[in-house]
A protein has these predicted regions:
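Long acidic/polar interaction regions in large eukaryotic complex-forming proteins
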Residues: 2-7, 36, 51-54, 61-64, ...
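Extended alpha-helical solenoid scaffold regions that build the rod-like backbones
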Residues: 63-292
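Extended amphipathic alpha-helical scaffold segments
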Residues: 6-57, 70, 138, 211, ...
């Protein structure tokens, strides 16, 4: 990754001139004023860069009211913007601050924080809005994408925001990342509730596969593609469900076993709808085979 992208755009003579101006203003006791003017200009550049990447300034309420399909598109744009910001834009701004305020580390740190704070808060607020939004099972996979993006960017948060002024931003990123983990666990709880609430209505003709069995098992199979991330999420909150032994199992496998146990209980209740005991047995056999 080219961390010098911004410095490369600016001629060396311009950076040297900015350094001379900063040095004179700090020496004259106008360090804060210099930092403020510099930060305002660079902040505008960052905001424009995020806008060009497609990131919109959305309130939490706007995110929550957005149709899911539109929010999926916003999440894709957010992932791109977050990666470019943390891996390219912010490190470049850090290097530029260090060049302009060379010899004045406190002014450099303060200026960098002021430059990046607004854009960082914009990125984190969107992730937070996703985390505290609806926990409908269909949202799992995109929320996993946001969780994984923040997780993978944690080393960048640690290195780029390492000074005293930026510790709040770093801690906020960790807090929101953990909140996304809570949201993912909440989605699995909602899946459990969905199974419990699925009513025993008309019997499936011929004792065939019930839609709830197909939905839940296809959902779990799709979720298992992100099993490493899900294991990390559930290991953060080890609370074995009642009736399931976890002595030699991961927290994720315990969760999966519990959901399948709920599904089997739900299907057993549905099998009692059949007046013909043979059809009831066929129903359990067909659905049991699909679950296995």
């Amino acid at each position: 990754t080219d961390y010098n992208i911004i410095i490369d755009v600016l001629p060396s003579v311009t950076i040297n001139d900015l350094h001379e101006i900063a040095k004179r203003m700090v020496a004259a006791g106008f360090g804060k004023e210099c930092s403020h003017v510099y930060s305002s200009l660079r902040r505008e550049f960052l905001e424009e860069s995020l806008s060009r990447l497609g990131l919109k300034k959305l309130s939490i309420e706007e995110v929550h009211k957005m149709p899911w399909q539109d929010l999926e598109d916003e999440i894709e744009r957010w992932i791109k913007a977050a990666n470019v910001s943390l891996r390219i834009l912010f490190p470049s701004e850090r290097r530029l601050c260090d060049r302009v305020f060379f010899g004045f580390s406190s002014a450099s740190d303060l200026s960098f924080m002021e430059v990046c704070r607004g854009s960082t808060i914009q990125l984190l607020n969107f992730a937070d809005a996703v985390a505290i939004g609806s926990r409908s099972p269909e949202r799992l996979f995109k929320i996993l994408d946001v969780f994984e993006t923040l997780r993978d960017l944690m080393p960048e948060f640690e290195s780029v925001f390492s000074d005293q002024y930026c510790v709040v931003l770093r801690n906020e990123a960790i807090t929101i990342w953990k909140r996304l983990g809570e949201a993912i666990r909440g989605i699995f709880m909602e899946l459990e509730n969905l199974i419990r609430r699925d009513p025993a209505k008309a019997a499936v003709p011929g004792g065939g596969l019930h839609p709830i069995a197909r939905y839940v098992m296809n959902y779990l199979r799709a979720a298992c593609r992100s099993c490493q991330t899900l294991e990390q999420v559930f290991d953060e909150n080890v609370v074995p469900s009642k009736g399931v032994s976890s002595s030699s199992s991961s927290s994720l496998s315990v969760q999966m076993d519990w959901i399948m146990e709920l599904l089997e209980s739900n299907l057993e209740a549905k099998s009692k709808i059949y007046k013909d005991s043979a059809l009831s047995s066929v129903f359990m056999m067909n659905n049991g085979r699909y679950i296995v």
